[in-house]
Swiss-Prot record:
Binds 2 heme b groups non-covalently. GO terms for molecular function: metal ion binding; ubiquinol-cytochrome-c reductase activity. A ubiquinone binds at H199. This is Cytochrome b. Heme 1 (or BL or b562) is low-potential and absorbs at about 562 nm, and heme 2 (or BH or b566) is high-potential and absorbs at about 566 nm.
Length: 214
């Protein structure tokens, strides 16, 4: 039971927890807002990491070590950004699973914008994974970008353009850093559209009850 008369005297966190929400939705509806929180954390930590990062194949790994060892609270920024990315994907897969289970895909505009968001997010994560330029980064960059060569006629040209040459080298890392930096802004824009489209029709109603049943 929520005593609405006393809500004005409660702490902000308590007010947030007591936010009146219809009984016809559950905890599974929290993950959209959790994703926005993850996005804000990633952009904030990513900005401070980008200040100290060097997009050069000879210095990239050393710059990551420098961030972790020498930059004040750099180790927190680096770990939060890395672990936050994993949390981001956990939240988004639960968010998608809820949508599939409850039939949110019937709201086509919201679903298509969300699918596009997932593709951009996966691309952003891939570019970020390459940036430390360790052994696994180099392997990932080589294997994943080589998939472009499977595209008929244009594949080899696209791969050469993405690499900035005939092999993965310094221009590749520079391009990946630029893409990793710019794509989150595309995610912000598309997330805004995703939310606007959602509130245009409203979320689905899993129990089939009246929205104002409470």
């Amino acid at each position: 039971y929520i005593n609405y008369k006393n809500m004005s005297h409660q702490h902000l966190l308590t007010l947030f927890n007591l936010l009146p929400v219809g009984a016809n939705i559950s905890t599974w509806w929290n993950f959209g807002s959790m994703l926005l929180s993850c996005l804000m954390i990633q952009i904030a930590t990513g900005f401070f990491l980008a200040i100290h990062y060097t997009a050069n194949i000879n210095m990239a790994f050393s710059s990551i070590v420098h961030i972790s060892r020498d930059v004040p609270y750099g180790w927190i920024m680096q770990n939060t950004h890395a672990i936050g990315a994993s949390l981001f994907f956990i939240c988004i897969y639960i968010h998608i699973a809820r949508g599939i289970y409850y039939g949110s895909y019937l709201n086509k505009e919201v679903w298509l914008s969300g699918t596009t968001l997932l593709i951009i997010l996966m691309a952003t994560a891939f570019f970020g994974y390459v940036l430390p330029w360790g052994q696994m980064s180099f392997w990932a960059a080589t294997v994943i970008t080589n998939l472009l060569t499977a595209i008929p006629y244009l594949g080899t040209t696209l791969t050469t353009w993405l690499w900035g040459g005939f092999a993965i080298n310094d221009p590749t890392l520079t391009r990946f850093f630029a893409l990793h930096f710019i794509l989150p802004f595309a995610i912000i824009s598309l997330s805004s559209l995703h939310i606007l489209l959602l509130h245009n029709e409203g979320s689905n109603n899993p129990l089939g009850t009246n929205s104002d049943i409470d």
